[in-house]
Amino acid sequence: MNIILASASPRRKEILENTNVRFDIIKNEIDEIILEGETPKHLVMRLAFEKSMSVASEHNEDVVIGADTVVVLDNAILGKPKDESCARDMLKRLSGREHQVITGISLINLCEDKKVIDYVISNVKFKTLSEQDIEDYLKTNESFDKAGAYGIQGYGALLVEEIRGDYFNIVGLPISRLGDLLKKYFSINLFYGV
């Protein structure tokens, strides 16, 4: 049984590489749309499941991991900004405020008929940002492929006042919860590998 990460995210790859488990990466191909009335928790769990299922259908003997992360402020989902103006607006909205980062994770092994879906929530409080802080951060080009227009593992850490919860969840893969689920449902220990 192999592990496959159904993600093109370099951050998720790096987090999983810090364990002793061997894995392959296969990029998933799904449309990340929000369904009408869908809550952020349901959205990330559904998208994580769709990502893992899109790969598991052709790799049914493997454990396929899917993940999806969103930033939530005032019950509004902040996805990846489409352009610099959108990123600027997101950072202004986040300035001085606390928001949630929610990551859905899905583990599927079709051969054993196992499907596990979960989510993790972390809270992040931003410093009060000046216009110059926002412009300086935008110049780093970190905003454009990240939910909420920032990456805490890079220069985005300079925007953050406080976090509560799993740091790796904020980066995009809650490795502690993932390790618990792999051990409980698939007898895979991230300390030792498969």
UniProtKB/Swiss-Prot annotation:
<feature type="site" description="Important for substrate specificity">
    <location>
        <position position="11"/>
    </location>
</feature>
<dbReference type="InterPro" id="IPR029001">
    <property type="entry name" value="ITPase-like_fam"/>
</dbReference>
<dbReference type="InterPro" id="IPR003697">
    <property type="entry name" value="Maf-like"/>
</dbReference>
<keyword id="KW-0963">Cytoplasm</keyword>
<dbReference type="GO" id="GO:0005737">
    <property type="term" value="C:cytoplasm"/>
</dbReference>
<protein>
    <recommendedName>
        <fullName>dTTP/UTP pyrophosphatase</fullName>
        <ecNumber>3.6.1.9</ecNumber>
    </recommendedName>
</protein>
<feature type="active site" description="Proton acceptor">
    <location>
        <position position="68"/>
    </location>
</feature>
<dbReference type="GO" id="GO:0036221">
    <property type="term" value="F:UTP diphosphatase activity"/>
</dbReference>
<comment type="similarity">
    <text>Belongs to the Maf family. YhdE subfamily.</text>
</comment>
<dbReference type="GO" id="GO:0036218">
    <property type="term" value="F:dTTP diphosphatase activity"/>
</dbReference>
<keyword id="KW-0546">Nucleotide metabolism</keyword>
<feature type="site" description="Important for substrate specificity">
    <location>
        <position position="69"/>
    </location>
</feature>
<dbReference type="Pfam" id="PF02545">
    <property type="entry name" value="Maf"/>
</dbReference>
<keyword id="KW-0378">Hydrolase</keyword>
<comment type="function">
    <text>Nucleoside triphosphate pyrophosphatase that hydrolyzes dTTP and UTP. May have a dual role in cell division arrest and in preventing the incorporation of modified nucleotides into cellular nucleic acids.</text>
</comment>
<dbReference type="GO" id="GO:0009117">
    <property type="term" value="P:nucleotide metabolic process"/>
</dbReference>
<feature type="site" description="Important for substrate specificity">
    <location>
        <position position="153"/>
    </location>
</feature>
